[in-house]
């Protein structure tokens, strides 16, 4: 909710590639999700947290033309920030403050690397080497550089800070519900999950309305980030407008944000340089950017598998499983998914794209159809004493 204010503060400040960020300002580190080569630094400056995403440029010898997915990801951040976040269309996308192409990635990596030597492969096999995932990533990148498989230039992007990703938050919510008074907490759990799903589905709907050829292509729970705010009063609300409907959410609470656009596309607007080749195989892999069910299917099936994993790990009995089934059935045809799950678990889990696969397409709706249905009616009543403090996607914008 404070993105616009922070954008005005950071956007015009130049980035000093040699001295930024100050090592003392780095509070935590992580690596990109889903096998990404990116690294992420959480920095605190003037009591404001933000994420610094470091995007190396790797060389792929088998390609005549090097894929530009990482450069396209930055363009998506910039596009969505300008088109949707700063204009109050939606706050549910991770915004970018600024970015810069810097030189000499080796010096940068050595500056932020812990004072440890990188282990050899033999040492990894024969010794109990205590290295974090972040440290391993740095060592791998340095190795790429030594073997001339990484350019000296890299992208440094300053992004909006979020507290954690949806996969972790979902697990924390489940722990709280099932280990601390199930009966009293299950309703609140489903309310919070409904809020998150509304925010993401609303955002997908307005983007797809504007750009029918948009597809995120990697919309799993690890790529949804979560921020939580409690600075507003209980009677302060935010309003969301879609077609003839208005939805009201308490200003306090969860704000889910779509992140990671490395495989995203808007046909004829933002396309990677490999899309011309991808089109030749899209039919084989059931991939179609104009299929508006694909992204929401990925998100819902990932939640389904997260629930399944938790149920198995904690050996939940039927009385505690049924509420989950009833909730998920509002969004996805659980009977059909369960049937496929029992017949071919691995095929279901490995199916990312569903264009032309009618048995999967029929289990869900498009984002537009979810919004126009009654599944989010809990957010359509505004309390009598409520005060609306922000309007998103208002027809007056």
Swiss-Prot record:
Span of domain Protein kinase: 25-397
Reported EC number(s) for this entry are: 2.7.11.1
Tell where it localizes: Virion
Q: Which reaction does it catalyse?
A: L-seryl-[protein] + ATP = O-phospho-L-seryl-[protein] + ADP + H(+); L-threonyl-[protein] + ATP = O-phospho-L-threonyl-[protein] + ADP + H(+)
Reply yes or no: does the keyword rRNA-binding apply.
no
Sorted alphabetically, the Gene Ontology cellular component annotations on this record are: virion component
Q: According to its UniProt record, which residues of this chain constitute the active site? A: 218 (proton acceptor)
> Is the keyword Glycoprotein assigned to this protein?
no
Source organism, top-level taxon: Viruses
Q: Which UniProt keywords apply?
A: ATP-binding, Kinase, Nucleotide-binding, Serine/threonine-protein kinase, Transferase, Virion
Q: What is its main location?
A: virion
PROSITE patterns reported in the protein's UniProt record: PROTEIN_KINASE_DOM
Can you provide one Gene Ontology molecular function annotated for this UniProt record?
protein serine kinase activity
Top EC class of this enzyme: transferase
- What InterPro entries does the database record attribute to this sequence? Kinase-like_dom_sf (IPR011009), Prot_kinase_dom (IPR000719)
Q: Which residues bind ATP?
A: 31-39, 53
State the similarity comment.
Answer: Belongs to the protein kinase superfamily. Ser/Thr protein kinase family.
Record protein name field:
Putative serine/threonine-protein kinase R301
């Amino acid at each position: 909710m404070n993105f616009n204010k922070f954008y005005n503060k950071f956007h015009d400040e130049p980035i000093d590639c040699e001295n930024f960020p100050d090592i003392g300002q780095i509070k935590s580190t992580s690596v990109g999700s889903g096998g990404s080569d990116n690294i992420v630094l959480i920095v605190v400056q003037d009591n404001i947290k933000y994420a610094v995403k470091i995007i190396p440029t790797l060389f792929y010898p088998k390609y005549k033309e090097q894929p530009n997915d990482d450069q396209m990801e930055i363009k998506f951040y910039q596009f969505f920030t300008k088109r949707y976040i700063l204009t109050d269309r939606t706050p549910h996308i991770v915004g970018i403050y600024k970015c810069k192409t810097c030189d000499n990635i080796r010096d940068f990596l050595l500056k932020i690397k812990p004072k440890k030597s990188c282990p050899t492969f033999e040492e990894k096999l024969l010794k109990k080497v205590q290295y974090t995932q972040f440290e391993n990533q740095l060592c791998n990148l340095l190795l790429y550089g030594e073997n001339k498989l990484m350019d000296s230039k890299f992208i440094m992007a300053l992004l909006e800070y979020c507290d954690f990703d949806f996969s972790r938050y979902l697990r924390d919510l489940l722990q709280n519900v099932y280990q601390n008074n199930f009966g009293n907490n299950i309703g609140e759990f489903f309310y919070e999950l409904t809020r998150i799903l509304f925010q993401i589905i609303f955002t997908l709907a307005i983007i797809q309305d504007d750009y029918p050829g948009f597809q995120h292509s990697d919309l799993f729970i690890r790529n949804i980030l979560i921020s939580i705010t409690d600075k507003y009063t209980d009677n302060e609300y935010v309003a969301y407008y879609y077609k003839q409907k208005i939805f009201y959410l308490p200003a306090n609470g969860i704000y889910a944000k779509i992140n990671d656009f490395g495989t995203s596309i808007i046909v004829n607007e933002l396309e990677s340089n490999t899309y011309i080749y991808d089109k030749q195989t899209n039919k084989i892999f059931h991939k179609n950017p104009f299929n508006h069910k694909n992204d929401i299917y990925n998100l819902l099936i990932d939640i389904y598998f997260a629930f399944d994993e938790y149920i198995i790990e904690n050996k939940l009995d039927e009385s505690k499983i049924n509420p989950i089934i009833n909730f998920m059935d509002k969004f996805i045809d659980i009977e059909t998914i369960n049937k496929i799950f029992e017949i071919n678990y691995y095929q279901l889990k490995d199916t990312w794209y569903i264009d032309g696969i009618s048995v999967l397409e029929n289990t869900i709706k498009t984002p537009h159809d979810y919004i126009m249905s009654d599944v989010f009616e809990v957010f359509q009543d505004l309390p009598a004493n409520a005060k609306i403090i922000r309007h998103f996607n208002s027809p007056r914008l």
